[in-house]
Each structure stands twice: as C-alpha cells, then as structure tokens.
Amino acid sequence: MHDKIVVLDFGSQYTQLIARRVRETGVYSEIRPCTVEADAIDALNPSGVILSGGPCSVYDEAGPALDPALLELERPDGTPVPLLGICYGLQAMAHQFGGEVARADRREFGRAQLQVPPDGQEKSLLFEGVPSGSTVWMSHSDHLTDLPDGYEVIARTDNAPVAAVRDTDGPYYGVQFHPEVVHTDYGRQILENFAHAICGCSGDWTPASFVEEQTETIRDRVGDRHVILGLSGGVDSSVAAALLQRALGDQLHCIFVNNGLLRKGEWNQVQDTFRGHFEMDLRTTDATDRFLERLDGVTDPEEKRTIVGNTFIEVFEEQTEAIAADLGHRPTYLAQGTLYPDLIESVSFKGPSVTIKTHHNVGGLPEELDFDLIEPFRELFKDEVREIGRLLDVPDPIVGRHPFPGPGLAIRILGQITRERLALLREADAIFIEELRANDLYDEVWQAFAVLLPVQAVGVMGDERTYENVCALRAVTSVDGMTADWAHLPHDFLGHVSNRIVNEVPGINRIVYDVSSKPPATIEWE
C-alpha cells in the first residue's frame, strides 16, 4: 500500500498540477472537491492533505469553507495528518482558525523574491534546501494580516509580509505563493519537503511499480475471460492495449475502425504497430463510406460529433459480435483509456457552468452493450501514461503523439466534409507535423494541427488568379490541456511551412496562424 497525499480542490486552475508535482516526488496523490467532509478524507487514510488555491475570497458568500474537522484527522500512529494550504487554501485555513484576511486593493501577480530568515529554515522543514532570495510565483488578491493563535511567519516577500506560516503546535503550514508552477524556482523542493520530511512518505510510487501492480490486478480480475478494446491509435488506447496484452496475452481483442477521418498514414501505422510489433489480435474494418455518407451536408459541430459517435458504436458492436462468434461467447470486459483528468472534471469544485462542447471521447459506449469496464489509467495523468508506454515498448511515434479528438478530422474541417476537403487537410496537416519534427519543435508543444476553413481567398500563382481554400495552423503549449497558450513558433519556421503547403497542396492558397489562448478560445476549433 502506497502513501497518499490528498489534494482538496478549491477551484484553482493549478489543482491538477499540484497532484502531478507531488507524484513527481514518488508519492501518490488524489484530488477531491473541497466540499468533501473530513470523514471521507479520513477514509482515504492520507499521509497529508494539501489545500489548493482558488478564485474566491473568504468573504464571498458562495466561497468554499474549510471543514474544521480536518485538523482533527489522525494517522494510524495517532499523529495529526499534516496540512499545507496554498494561496486561497492558506487564507481559508487561517480565516477558519481565527486569523484575519484582508481584501487587497490590487492583485499581486507575478514573480517575487522569497525571503526565508535563517530561523525560518531552522523552525520549518518546509524550506529545507530552499535558499533565501529564490523566486516564487504570486497570484492572489486577499492576503493574511493577523495570524491565528499559535501560528508564526516563516517567510515573506517585499509585497507580502506573510508569505508562509506554520502552526507551532502541529504540522500545519501555509504559503501565499504557488510552489506547483515552474516559475517558483524551488517549488518541487517545497512540495517534496512537505510530502517526505513533514508527512513521512517513502516515495515508492513510480510508473514501473504501477505497471507491475496493474498487471496483477488485471489478471486477478479477468481470470480466463476476454476483453475488447477500441483502439484509436492515440496515446491512451495504445498504451492501454500494450498493458492489457502484457497482462492477458490473447485474451485481449482490439478493434480499430477506419472512419475516414484519420490523419495521413494513420490507418497503416496503427496496423503495422499492433499486428507487427505487438502481434495482437487486431480486428480492423474500413467504414469510411458509412461515416462520410452520414456526415454528408452536415455543418453543425455538435451534430458531427453525434453522428461520428453513434456510427462508431454501431460499427464497434458489429465487430464485437464477430469476435463473439469466433470465441463462442461474448467478451466480458470493455477496456478504455480513461485518464484521471476525465474523472476529476466531475468531482472538482465548480461554480455555475455550461457545456462548451461534447467531450471528444467517442469510446464511451452505451450501457445496453453490457460490458464490465476496465480503466487501468483512471488514476493517471497523460504524461504518466506516456512514461508507462515507453516502459512497455510502445513506439515513440505513437507514445509521443499529440492528442487527437475522437471525431477526428470531422471537427478540423469547418463546414461540410467531403473526400476532397479531407484530402486537402491531411496533406496540409502532415506537412506541418513533419516540419515540427524536423525542426525539433514537435515535443515542445502540447498539440499542433491544421484546420481547413469554410472560406476561400484570392491569390496569384504564376500569372494566374486563384480562388482557393484558407488553412489555419494551430499549435499550443499546455500542461494538461485544461488551459493553453498559443505556441510562439519562430516566424521563419511558420513562413517555411506556409510556403510548403501552398506549393505542395493544390487547392490551398493562404495560411493563417491561430494566436488564441484557452480560455477564451478552446484548443480545437469545433
């Protein structure tokens, strides 16, 4: 049984990053909404609890409050469960226990120099190995002015006289800055100090240990029964297939559907990898005609998603019945590459929200198909799945691949989908990706792709006027896809890509580059 740190989510955009940073220190972490009661946290048997930041003020009526019973939690040895409050987490903790939090006249945002007096390092394990004068990242409006009884300041900045505190009677700490972001120089050290030195975690949780444990868990659960998996060629389903084959061998049956909306070369690449490299039972079917006939004339993105999703389910069920006929019985389990962010989206603290777009994952099959689910990665982040893929010898062109939406190129063609427009987009996209790889930029961005727009523009090729399609290029940097910034690719590089596409893809005469961040935009255009 591994040690565990629980992260309570108060609505911060960095909550997932906190959990990931803790895991990087070899300690397993889980996210729970801040509204969960202390008894439910206690049932998880945590070695420590981290309170995330958040957008609210402790004075907001709708602002989340801290359950005071958190300070009564004990570990099996009878010692208190340590707490670390980050930004709003610090303010909520201090406010709950009698401290004073003041509204700031203006927001403090950006880098600051952390001043840790020598006695602060001596008094607190939190700053062991953290030099005074190191850079930290501030992002807050309210600030702590009077400490709760028994608390003392252990660090400050020029603009924040209370940058970090501790309880002199218990293992309770708070910082006004964000140790989880890369802009905080020694942020990982601070989180490692909390997890290891303060919480006493051993740091034995690793992707390699996960593979061994999951392999045994899957074998024990499945026994001599059979599993099917919808293979898309993306990272999650591909690594899931490799793990399940390691555990089950020929009890795994993969289904790969060509919906006519794949990237250039993807249909052959996936078959070569999983039939050739892994020697899996891979059932393939080319349903291009069926998908494109149903998408004919459709322009609404939500309708596209619905058609692609429903048609996929139909084809998937046909292939499942064929597998059942070969086996003489229906497979018991359906495996999916669900990731931890997919789950914590439904449990994190949120205010009022609206559906922006239906989730890209079309692998969510209806209950009437009557499978038991196996989701081996439901507790992992994308970067952890990539690392596991490398441990399982999944080829790098697949394990390092950028995210690709379930509806495929259907939502990267704005407007009507035709075979001709799909061919244009595939070629433009392939050139963009090829050049990113050739210039060692592919791994520097979270996601990159081309989008075919529903407009045409005037151009000149030689001495002739052209009136052809406009193609947009999109590249973003991100940690988890929840927020993203447009990638600041070199202008010379973009110019070269533009020239190649316009000269090598007849039918496109103009290239534009998307410089929108998420939010307010989304990563995909539809």
UniProtKB/Swiss-Prot annotation:
InterPro entries associated with the record: Class_I_gatase-like, GATASE, GMP_synth_C, GMP_synth_GATase, GMP_synthase, GMPS_ATP_PPase_dom, NAD/GMP_synthase, Rossmann-like_a/b/a_fold
Catalytic activity: XMP + L-glutamine + ATP + H2O = GMP + L-glutamate + AMP + diphosphate + 2 H(+)
Function: Catalyzes the synthesis of GMP from XMP.
GO molecular function: ATP binding; GMP synthase activity
Active-site residues, as the UniProt record annotates them: 87 (nucleophile), 178, 180
EC number assigned by the record: 6.3.5.2
Gene: guaA
Domain GMPS ATP-PPase intervals: 205-401
Top-level enzyme category: ligase
Span of domain Glutamine amidotransferase type-1: 4-204
Binding positions (ATP): 232-238
Subunit relationships: Homodimer.
Protein name, entry field: GMP synthase [glutamine-hydrolyzing]
CC annotations in GO: cytosol
Keywords for this protein: ATP-binding, Glutamine amidotransferase, GMP biosynthesis, Ligase, Nucleotide-binding, Purine biosynthesis
Keyword ATP-binding (UniProt): yes
Pathway where this protein functions: Purine metabolism; GMP biosynthesis; GMP from XMP (L-Gln route): step 1/1
Domain of life, per lineage: Bacteria
Organism: Salinibacter ruber (strain DSM 13855 / M31)
